From Swiss-Prot:
GO terms for molecular function: ABC-type heme transporter activity; ATP binding; ATP hydrolysis activity. Keywords: ATP-binding, Cell inner membrane, Cell membrane, Cytochrome c-type biogenesis, Membrane, Nucleotide-binding, Translocase, Transport. Belongs to the ABC transporter superfamily. CcmA exporter (TC 3.A.1.107) family. The complex is composed of two ATP-binding proteins (CcmA) and two transmembrane proteins (CcmB). The keyword Nucleotide-binding applies. It is found in: Cell inner membrane. Its EC number is 7.6.2.5. The keyword Translocase applies. GO terms for cellular component: plasma membrane. It comes from Pseudomonas aeruginosa. This is Cytochrome c biogenesis ATP-binding export protein CcmA. It comes from the Bacteria. Its main location: membrane. The lineage of its organism: Bacteria, Pseudomonadati, Pseudomonadota, Gammaproteobacteria, Pseudomonadales.
């Protein structure tokens, strides 16, 4: 269970959000909406433990993040605005390297299977810089298939995806929820999601 208790977030001297409280339990998806600059990314980074709230607390399984940082990171996948993969490596080697850094024991066969699901099997040996932005985004999202993590925090995961890719992403999130996973996301693109809760920033 992920809880936000009376959270406040700032950027510089500007307060982006205040007194934000919610709770997400297994099987739920929290969708965060708001205009650009309303604090969506700040909120997601705070929930991931990468930013310190101006006030309030984030709890995981009833305990503050600071008391269980390493354990929390092993149960979390954070997919931010950036792709987070190296331009000079191919998709296969990128995902193998990323999994090793994340401490996930995956085989080449597992990575190839994930690339096949995201439609990149034929491009797995191409240098990453030669892929389109949509293909790069799909390669980045393939990590969700490889990492067995309970909580997904996804910042605009549908960016650069076409209609097919967005539909696949919605189905993937639904599968994760059906297995007891939790999701927090922002998206400008309409996704077919079983959303349990909505937070509107700047309202």
């Amino acid at each position: 269970m992920l809880e936000a208790l009376d959270l406040a977030g700032v950027r510089g001297e500007r307060r982006l959000f205040d007194h934000l409280t919610f709770r997400i339990v297994p099987g739920e998806c929290l969708s965060v909406h708001g205009e650009n600059g309303s604090g969506k990314t700040t909120l997601l980074r705070t929930l991931a433990g990468f930013a310190t709230p101006a006030a309030g607390r984030v709890l995981w399984k009833g305990k503050p993040l600071r008391n269980q940082w390493s354990e929390y990171q092993r149960e979390l996948v954070y997919n931010g605005h950036g792709i987070g993969l190296k331009e000079d490596l191919n998709a296969l080697d990128n995902l193998l390297a990323a999994a090793a850094i994340a401490g996930e024991p995956v085989t080449t066969e597992c990575v190839e299977s994930a690339l096949d699901e995201v439609g990149l099997a034929e491009h797995r040996h191409l240098p990453f810089r030669m892929l389109s932005q949509g293909q790069k985004r799909r390669a980045s999202l393939a990590r969700l298939l490889l990492y067995r993590r309970k909580l997904w925090i996804l910042d605009e995961p549908s960016t650069a995806l076409d209609q097919f890719g967005a539909r696949w992403l919605g189905e993937l999130i639904h599968r994760h929820q059906s297995r007891g996973g939790m999701v927090v996301l922002t998206s400008h693109q309409e996704l077919a999601l079983k959303t349990s809760q909505t937070v509107r920033m700047g309202a």
